[in-house]
């Protein structure tokens, strides 16, 4: 415990584990970390005091809750990577004097900095920049924060000839604090927080360079964006770089082309074209989704893609989402292509008088939505402009909320286990600007927490990060190389039932407002296929594989028997191809392996004579002779059990 001798212990700090400790006012976050353990002090990168991210040198002056942040925390990574972006900018300014600075934030996987330069950067420049960055780290500059008035800040950045910084400062509302951070000779406009010094960054690497429009607007100048990553240990960097190499091999855009699953064309950027094999995977996912939902009392609906502007004004999308929507004129009126399925489901609910006996009402929809994304952020199937959301909207009474949430949690868990995904859960609570009463928020948040506890699911709390219309649970999948993907969401929504004046007749004969729960499992069918492609590296489990078996006759004289084998498999709805080309068997096997087909059935003289097949597995190689009946029994069982 932090020793105060005989001094007065003036405040109580509640730590991450719930323990309360007394400290004198003015103690820093770092000193509190050191009082807990030397190890924690060494690993600490910042703090979270009463929900606000603070620096290690921040003085605590009042009672409150404090989490010491390390690199293991998402907020800790953001602090670490934010400082790393400043190290990058300082190195670039040292080497390329005429470069102008734009912005340099921490992102989900590292950091970037945008530069305006006449000579585009190339990866050949990285060696010199990294060398300079390592010098800056070795020089161990303190990061010193200072504040200027708006007028002073503009003058300061004009003197430094940094037009992008001047533009940013001019956009800051009057009266807001304008802060800067200095490290050595380098100064940047920045709100922080940061590490205490550059020397705390132990391993840093530049990853790539790309073009990026200033403020993401295609009408603005194209800047040069350098991406990087950093870690507190070199071993962590090495592990990450290995993962990145593995990710390149698994890139769904590369595999999508090689396996003939989908394509994207300049005639429709962000609008994927699914090929026959890609459609097989898609249809399997959708059929499985439908079957499991019907089993659990859901009813499928289909709502129009284009709806009148009045609907979007009522739903709130017109005010909050208009710039991401596409519009068209019909009969002199404005219509929008739907960016979300929710308003359509509201109209279905509202189409008839509902009783409490009808609730819970579970409406599900595989709804095609369109959202305008800037061309620079489009990425294969992961970030598109047109996609299918596996939405469901559940309408219920207050008494039913917890059970309905638990039902959705169990369904999400069932789905992810089928695909072999581990996952973690995050609960996002009420933000400062929210709609709905205190009672509604308390009911909703407690119901989410209680359902998570009943499901025995550990969860992380993101205080104040819920939507303004309700708290939510997010499910983050972990793929086979350790990356996480946010897919499933359970979102309680107070806004839609209110805006659409949804009602049901209660047992008291009076009208009541239902509670609505919005949820997705896949998130987007397209993105989920992209994730699965990378998770399995294109080697889909047999039940999902577009082609499950390829029959390979050794020579032309085996074609007749091979066709009989092919037809027998077809009779059992096994997805099979016959490769009867005049090619050597070794070539045919290699090609089937490159296509990642689960099973090859090779037929030659011996197989024709004995009436069986020679089995070769994608996973286990040559498995020798097997009767066709036994193989059919084996593969049908594998498909039925959805074996991985």
From Swiss-Prot:
Keywords tagged on the record: Aminoacyl-tRNA synthetase, ATP-binding, Cytoplasm, Ligase, Metal-binding, Nucleotide-binding, Protein biosynthesis, RNA-binding, tRNA-binding, Zinc
Gene3D superfamilies to which the protein is assigned, alphabetical: 3.10.20.30, 3.30.54.20, Anticodon-binding domain (3.40.50.800), Bira Bifunctional Protein, Domain 2 (3.30.930.10), Threonyl-trna Synthetase, Chain A, domain 2 (3.30.980.10)
Alphabetized InterPro entries for the sequence: aa-tRNA-synt_IIb, aa-tRNA-synth_II, aa-tRNA-synth_II/BPL/LPL, Anticodon-bd, Anticodon-bd_dom_sf, Beta-grasp_dom_sf, TGS, TGS-like
GO CC annotation: cytoplasm
Binding site for Zn(2+): 342, 393, 518
Family annotation (CDD domains): TGS_ThrRS, ThrRS_anticodon, ThrRS_core
Cofactor(s) required for function per UniProt: Zn(2+)
EC number from the UniProt entry: 6.1.1.3
PROSITE patterns associated with the record: AA_TRNA_LIGASE_II, TGS
Annotated GO biological process: threonyl-tRNA aminoacylation
Molecular functions per Gene Ontology: ATP binding; catalytic activity, acting on a protein; metal ion binding; threonine-tRNA ligase activity; transferase activity; tRNA binding
Keyword Transcription regulation: no
A Pfam family it matches: HGTP_anticodon
Domain TGS residues, every copy: 8-70
Complexes and interactors: Homodimer.
Family stated for the protein in its record: Belongs to the class-II aminoacyl-tRNA synthetase family.
Name this polypeptide is given: Threonine--tRNA ligase
UniProt source species: Caldanaerobacter subterraneus subsp. tengcongensis (strain DSM 15242 / JCM 11007 / NBRC 100824 / MB4)
Biological classification of the source: Bacteria, Bacillati, Bacillota, Clostridia, Thermoanaerobacterales
């Amino acid at each position: 415990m932090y020793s105060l001798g005989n001094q007065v212990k003036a405040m109580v700090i509640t730590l991450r584990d719930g323990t309360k400790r007394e400290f004198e006012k003015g103690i820093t976050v770092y000193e509190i970390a050191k009082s807990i353990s030397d190890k924690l002090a060494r690993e600490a990168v910042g703090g979270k005091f009463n929900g606000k991210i603070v620096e290690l040198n921040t003085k605590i002056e009042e009672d409150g809750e404090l989490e010491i942040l390390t690199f293991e925390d998402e907020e800790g990574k953001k602090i670490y990577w934010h400082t790393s972006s400043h190290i990058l900018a300082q190195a670039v300014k040292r080497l390329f004097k005429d470069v102008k600075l734009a912005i340099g934030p921490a992102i989900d996987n590292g950091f970037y900095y945008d530069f305006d330069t006449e000579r585009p950067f190339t990866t050949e420049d990285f060696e010199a920049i990294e060398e300079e960055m390592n010098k800056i780290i070795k020089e161990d500059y303190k990061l010193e924060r200072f504040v200027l008035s708006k007028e002073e800040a503009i003058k300061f950045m004009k003197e430094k000839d940094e037009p992008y910084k001047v533009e940013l400062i001019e956009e800051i509302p009057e009266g807001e604090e304008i802060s800067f951070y200095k490290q050595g000779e380098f100064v940047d406009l920045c709100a922080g927080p940061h590490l205490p010094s550059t020397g705390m960054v132990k391993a840093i690497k530049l990853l790539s360079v790309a073009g990026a429009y200033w403020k993401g607007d295609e009408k603005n100048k194209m800047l040069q964006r350098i991406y990087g990553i950093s870690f507190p240990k070199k071993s962590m960097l090495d592990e990450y770089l290995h993962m990145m190499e593995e990710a390149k091999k698994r890139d769904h855009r590369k595999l999508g082309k090689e396996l003939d699953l989908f394509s994207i064309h300049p005639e429709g950027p962000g609008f994927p074209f699914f090929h026959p094999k890609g459609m097989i995977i898609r249809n399997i996912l959708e059929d499985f989704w439908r079957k499991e939902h019907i089993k659990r009392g859901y009813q499928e609906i289909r709502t129009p893609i284009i709806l009148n502007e009045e609907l979007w004004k009522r739903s709130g999308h017109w005010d909050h989402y208009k710039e991401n929507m596409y519009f068209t004129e019909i009969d002199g009126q404005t219509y929008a292509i739907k960016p979300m399925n929710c308003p359509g489901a509201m109209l279905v609910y509202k189409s008839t008088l509902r009783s409490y006996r009808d609730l819970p009402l579970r409406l599900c929809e595989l709804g095609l939505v369109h959202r305008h994304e800037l061309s620079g952020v489009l990425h294969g199937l992961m970030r598109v402009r047109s996609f299918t959301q596996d939405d469901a909207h559940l309408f219920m009474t207050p008494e039913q909320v917890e059970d309905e949430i638990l039902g959705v949690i169990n369904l999400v868990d069932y789905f992810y286990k089928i695909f072999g995904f581990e996952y973690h859960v995050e609960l996002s609570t009420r933000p400062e600007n929210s709609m709905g009463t205190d009672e509604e928020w308390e009911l909703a948040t407690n119901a989410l927490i209680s359902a998570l506890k009943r499901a025995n699911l550990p969860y992380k709390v993101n205080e104040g990060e819920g939507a303004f219309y309700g708290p939510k649970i997010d499910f983050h999948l972990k793929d086979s190389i350790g990356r996480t993907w946010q897919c499933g969401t359970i979102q309680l929504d107070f806004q839609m039932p209110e805006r659409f004046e949804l009602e049901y007749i209660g047992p008291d004969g009076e009208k009541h407002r239902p509670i609505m729960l919005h949820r997705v499992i896949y998130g987007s069918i397209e993105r989920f296929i992209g994730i699965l492609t990378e998770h399995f590296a294109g080697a889909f489990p047999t039940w999902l594989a577009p082609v499950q078996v390829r029959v390979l006759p050794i020579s032309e004289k085996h074609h007749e028997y091979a066709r009989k084998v092919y037809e027998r498999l077809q009779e059992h709805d096994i997805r099979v191809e016959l490769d009867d080309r005049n090619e050597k068997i070794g070539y045919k096997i290699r090609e089937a392996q490159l296509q990642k087909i689960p099973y090859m059935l090779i037929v030659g003289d011996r197989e024709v004579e004995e009436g069986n097949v020679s089995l070769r597995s994608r996973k286990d190689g040559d498995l020798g002779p097997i009767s066709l009946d036994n193989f059919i029994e084996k593969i049908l069982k594998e498909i039925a059990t959805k074996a991985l």
